Amino acid sequence: MSSDSEKGRFSLLGLSEPELSAFIIHKASQANVEVSVIEDVYPCSPMQENIQMSKSRSHDAQYRMVAINHITLPRAGDSIDIHRLRHAWQQVADRHSILRTIFAESFDHGRFCDQIVLEHPDINFHEVSDVNQTPDGISFRQDSPAYLLTIMPLELDERGVVCRIEIDHTIIDGWSYGIMLRDWARAYAGKLREEGPAPQYSDYIAFLQTENHEAHLQYWLNALTGVQPCLVPGTMGLHVKRTQSSRSVPVLNIRSPILQAFCRKLKVTVFNVVQAAWTMVLRKYTGMDDVCFGYVAACRDLPIGNAEEIVGPLINMLVCRTRLDSLQSTSELVQAMQRQMIENGRHQTTSLGAIHHALKMRGLRLFNTAVNFRSFRRDKFQEHGIAIEVFEDRRNMEVSKISLA
């Protein structure tokens, strides 16, 4: 490798030339790959490190998204070409480097792990007779990206194929999934190469390295001064064995005309109303007037070029803290949620781990509940005559489990 190319590709590591050569050789050995196939190496984001650390503590932990997708062509009688579909996926992986990324430990450099981008890794792409027989939680190989695509052709009268995608949250979030499917459809139609270069996940890592982390952390310390752990079950005589679980409860009419009118009047969002509702639930079950919980920030509004087009986990868990004794009405509470959310958004890159450490929580959890808000509509991507529809999606609770584990 030439030193000039090394400087350009591996600049986010901040190593000198002698250190870099030894580092790359070591990483190749760790990952069981050849040095020649490594395109880039850079640090992980705080969220990625959080996931990797959680998995290392519990081998049973599964921080993955599983989705079943129906892929069709519009005209009756047309059939999906599996070979072409596989080639289209390869184009998507070529375009988005996070889909060619593996991970290796990096304790000796003050980090838990680093991510290694490979030039042309093997893609886990299989054809089966029944995708429902593919078990969840398969073991991914260390030397290939952490996802599996399983294709099942449908009967001729049903048209198309079913594709099951199981993918680790270390390399994707919900927003990214939509970009990935859209580009897959474009690639199958032969249109993806017409697009300009895509922004890469390394752009996000580079941005994080320029952030004033001390100033952001100080904001959170000020915002959380005097906060106490807000845990459910609380202190109201509820003595139950501690377990980890998640439940999904459909909320009907969440976008009713009455609620929409209420939000317009106060100039708030439906999510602010959901936050306010959960705040009141926490007061009920903890007996506390000063409560806090987590919520997910997409971080797609960061000042990074085309951040909305980056495939990779930009999400972060932020803290909502409310002192209910200072608020007089439900309207005031909802408006307080909005003001706090706007201010928190200016400091959204601070990791929850850094906040815990700065607060000297000493192994305690600040909260054990989190609120995420997304519509349960079916995602459908139609590009140039090919349609990909997500009709089973098991990603909804994963983000909360990542950050609360």
UniProtKB/Swiss-Prot annotation:
- As recorded in UniProt, its EC number(s) are 6.3.2.-
* Pathway membership: Mycotoxin biosynthesis
Q: Which UniProt keywords apply?
A: Ligase, Virulence
Segments for region (Condensation 1): 39-383
Q: Name one GO cellular component term.
A: cytoplasm
Cysteine disulfide partners in this protein: none
Decide whether keyword Ligase is in the record: yes
A GO term (biological process) for this protein?
A: amino acid activation for nonribosomal peptide biosynthetic process
GO MF terms here are: ligase activity; phosphopantetheine binding
Q: Which InterPro entries match?
A: CAT-like_dom_sf (IPR023213), Condensatn (IPR001242)
Function text: Nonribosomal peptide synthetase; part of the gene clusters that mediate the biosynthesis of the host-selective toxins (HSTs) ACT-toxins responsible for brown spot of tangerine disease by the tangerine pathotype which affects tangerines and mandarins. ACT-toxins consist of three moieties, 9,10-epoxy-8-hydroxy-9-methyl-decatrienoic acid (EDA), valine and a polyketide. ACT-toxin I is toxic to both citrus and pear; toxin II the 5''-deoxy derivative of ACT-toxin I, is highly toxic to pear and slightly toxic to citrus.
Q: What else is known?
A: Gene clusters encoding host-selective toxins (HSTs) are localized on conditionally dispensable chromosomes (CDCs), also called supernumerary chromosomes, where they are present in multiple copies. The CDCs are not essential for saprophytic growth but controls host-selective pathogenicity. Although conventional disruption of ACTT2 could not be accomplished due to the high number of the copies identified in the genome, the high sequence identity among these copies of ACTT2 is likely an advantage for RNA silencing, because it allows knockdown of all copies of this gene simultaneously.
Entry domain remark: NRP synthetases are composed of discrete domains (adenylation (A), thiolation (T) or peptidyl carrier protein (PCP) and condensation (C) domains) which when grouped together are referred to as a single module. Each module is responsible for the recognition (via the A domain) and incorporation of a single amino acid into the growing peptide product. Thus, an NRP synthetase is generally composed of one or more modules and can terminate in a thioesterase domain (TE) that releases the newly synthesized peptide from the enzyme.
Name of the molecule in the record: Nonribosomal peptide synthetase ACTTS1
State the species of origin: Alternaria alternata (Alternaria rot fungus)
